[in-house]
Amino acid sequence: MKRAFVTGGSGFVGGALIEALRGRGVEVVALARSDDAAAKVTALGATVARGDLDSVDVEDLRGCDVVFHSAALTKEHGTLAEHRKVNVEGTRAIVEAAQRAGVPRFVHVSTEAVLADGHPILRADENVPYPARPAGPYPISKGEAERLVLAANRAGFATVIIRPRFIWGAGDTSVLPQIVEMVKRGRFAWIGGGHHLTSTCNVSNVVEGALLAAERGAAGEIYFLTDGAPVEFRAFLTKLLATRGVTARERTVPKWVARLVAATTAWMRTPPVTKTAIALVGHEVTVVDDKARAQLGYASRVSIDEGLARMQTPSVSS
């Protein structure tokens, strides 16, 4: 791999990908739709391609060996139309641009959320079918995006999908900051006590899996990625919050109450809880990454303890 194109490069996963690629000496072209995004990817060593997913210049993709598509609308609320615009139509646009540019490989960063329908997910593998009724706009749109990417796979254009579960780690600009803010405002509660199991995937392990998918992933295949053995959600999140110097209150909300609140406040622009959030963190969600380990040589090299240590700020660790 000599040249790669990255979407979502100013975000959590995309930024980590750029950093890893540049560390390997790979030339990186990163899509940026704003001055702020352009500044971020430039600081990471990427060449800026100005535009949005639906307006990318095909010339910026020419000569690239692979596209890493990590850009997505990941919020738990919002309309289906909003999510489809970015996650489905945006994916369609970048896939078509990559095909026109003659890029031979396309790695799509997806999520275990494509299987979320409100029921626990127990040690799911890549053979589990998409649910009939996904739990909200985000799972719906990401599932549709996956189908689109798989359908685009053909001779000369190999598409590979990775599904990391609960991405976390140093540099998180999305999930953890939101949870920290909820805790600080007294709006956080453990759904059902939080003592269920969860799979997790440190951002460094996501990057490891993405790079391996680009190098060794079988065309038209999906690979789950995790940190290894599942952990108790409450214990893990407590440690994660501690890296920010924050402790969650003991308050617990029964799952049926959370579901009722989600149903009655779904009309709000920013509801206190959503059915998507409940589906993803309100009960067990565990997946197995045996396929990635066997076929890609994936090893989740960063342990949870090491990942937490990397997140410690001087003020917290002193």
Positions of the model-derived regions?
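N-terminal Rossmann NAD(P)H-binding glycine-rich loop of SDR-like oxidoreductase domains
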Residues: A4-R24
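NAD(P)-dependent short-chain dehydrogenase/reductase
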Residues: A152-I161, R165-N205, L240
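NAD(P)H-binding glycine-rich loop region in Rossmannoid oxidoreductase-like domains
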Residues: A37-T42, A46-A93, A97, D117
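Mid/C-terminal beta-alpha module of Rossmann-like enzyme folds, strongest
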Residues: L212-V273, D305-R310
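Catalytic helix-loop patch of NAD(P)-dependent Rossmann-fold dehydrogenases
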Residues: K85, P120-I167
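Amphipathic terminal alpha-helices
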Residues: D290-A294, A299-S318
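Conserved Rossmann-fold NAD(P)-dependent oxidoreductase catalytic core, especially the SDR/UDP-sugar
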Residues: E89, A93-P137
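Glycine/proline-rich active-site loop of Rossmann-fold NAD(P)-dependent oxidoreductases
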Residues: G143, F157, W168-Q178, S204, ...
